[in-house]
Design a protein with these regions (language model features):
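Conserved ABC ATPase "signature" region
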Residues: 105-121
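Helix-to-loop junction immediately C-terminal to a conserved catalytic motif
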Residues: 50
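Conserved H-loop
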Residues: 178-183
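Conserved ABC transporter NBD signature motif
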Residues: 58-72
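ABC-family nucleotide-binding domains
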Residues: 160
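Catalytic Walker B motif of ABC-type/P-loop ATPase nucleotide-binding domains
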Residues: 150-154
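Conserved ABC ATPase signature
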Residues: 125-129, 133
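ABC ATPase C-loop
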Residues: 142-143
Length: 227
């Protein structure tokens, strides 16, 4: 289980803390969703859990072991909102072999198959893929690393309805093997497969029952549609 206890993040350049008093418990092989508007601190929390930023105070545990930056980098794999900005390989094969030069073609194919990209040519450029395919490829990159926790920052943002449904279906399959933590400003589809949920606002996190959050978002979306 992932435990976060009283975590805060207050960089010296900021007058106010970006995150304050964060508590979170996420059991293994479950999917948790954090919902909040832009600027609420949700992406910063993802960066901290991925070991890309160091929290100012508080503790992070996995299976009762407290984690530092190095352990977090090994434990967690992150898929960014715009993964295409982070692709470095000229082809899908090169992308998946970054850091794994001895990776066999069979293992590459297996990883691509796990994310529904098994029919693609390994010589295809990552930048030639659609937005949904790029997010799937970014997931395949992380699956090859074999992290314990998959972190996803706005995985459905900017995708059409069909692509969103496909991605949500994929995440439902992945949570049978991995622990997933997802942040989103609009988690309507994601809540269909979520086991637990939180709302974040002004750097403060509050746990909320999934059914209650779904009802709130339905009302909000209905009002927005009428407007």
């Amino acid at each position: 289980m992932l435990h976060i206890r009283n975590l805060s993040y207050h960089p010296t350049a900021s007058i106010q803390p970006i995150l304050s008093g964060i508590d979170l418990d996420l059991p293994a092989q479950q999917l948790g969703v954090i919902v909040g508007p832009s600027g609420s601190g949700k992406s910063t929390l993802m960066d901290i859990l991925a070991g890309l930023a160091e929290h100012s105070s508080g503790s992070i545990f996995w299976r009762e072991q407290e984690l530092n930056l190095l352990y977090l980098q090994q434990l967690c794999g992150i898929v960014f909102q715009f993964p295409e900005r982070h692709f470095c390989g000229g082809t899908i094969l090169e992308e998946l072999r970054l850091g794994h030069p001895d990776l066999t073609s069979d293992r590459v194919r297996k990883a691509l198959g796990e994310v529904g990209l098994g029919d693609l040519s390994l010589q295809t450029s990552p930048h030639a893929l659609s937005g949904g395919q790029q997010r799937r490829l970014a997931l395949a990159v992380q699956l090859i690393r074999q992290p314990q926790i998959l972190l996803l920052d706005e995985p459905t943002a900017g995708l059409d309805w069909s692509m969103r449904r496909q991605l949500v279906s994929l995440l439902a399959q992945l949570k049978t093997q991995w622990t997933l933590l997802v942040v989103s400003h609009d988690a309507t589809e994601l809540l269909e497969i979520a086991d637990c949920a939180w709302q974040i606002s002004n750097g403060k996190l509050k746990e909320i029952p999934v059914a209650q959050l779904k009802a709130q978002l339905m009302i909000t979306n209905s009002i927005g549609a009428k407007g």
